């Protein structure tokens, strides 16, 4: 399960890549991130950049990593969030699988645990192509993430996982994140019906 990744591409580069996400010249690209620093280590429950759809185009903004947990798995009022989503057939996740709740999560590398006491193995593309996790997001969700903070209202995200490729399977045979590397795949993820998008 991927609970650590990096996003060190420059803010300017991310803005440039967004041109390939929009589908027509009338769409607006809005950057709400302010001064977006490189993030060499992104951990669960911390803010990270995502790209999401709006009625007028796309937004680059920050959201908190961890979608709402299925209620049956919560033992207390505290919800630590779910970072990786594999069972898309679950009714809990189906409500967020439509285009209105899909997002792209920029990354430059991700880590999988090597086993107890053995650290992490990092994975990255061999070239310098921009890459995104296939993510889902929800806006304005009220939950208790940290007891000391009390209930908060946050924009949340997580990303989908799939069967691992050969490189990742050697370290983590269960799953790996769904990674999208082409403008066509980005547009399909952001706009196609689930019947088509689920095959990415």
Task: Label each residue range with its predicted role.
Residues 1-200:
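Short linear sequence motif anchored by a di-proline
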């Amino acid at each position: 399960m991927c609970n650590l990744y990096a996003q060190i591409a420059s803010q300017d580069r991310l803005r440039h890549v967004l041109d390939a996400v929009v589908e027509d010249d009338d769409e607006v690209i809005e950057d709400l991130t302010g001064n977006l620093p490189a993030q060499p280590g992104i951990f669960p429950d911390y803010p990270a950049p995502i790209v999401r759809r709006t009625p007028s185009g796309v937004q680059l903004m920050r959201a908190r990593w961890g979608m709402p947990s299925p209620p049956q798995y919560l033992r207390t009022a505290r919800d630590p969030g779910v970072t990786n989503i594999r069972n898309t057939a679950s009714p809990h996740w189906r409500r967020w699988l439509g285009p209105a709740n899909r997002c792209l999560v920029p990354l430059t590398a991700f880590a999988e645990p090597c086993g107890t006491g053995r650290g992490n193995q990092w994975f990255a593309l061999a070239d310098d192509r921009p890459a995104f996790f296939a993510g889902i997001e929800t806006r304005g969700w009220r939950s208790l993430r940290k007891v000391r903070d009390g209930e908060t209202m946050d924009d949340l995200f997580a990303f989908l996982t799939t069967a691992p490729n050969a490189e990742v399977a050697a370290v983590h045979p269960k799953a790996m994140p769904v990674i999208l590397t082409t403008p066509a795949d980005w547009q399909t993820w952001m706009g196609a019906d689930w019947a088509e998008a689920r095959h990415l």
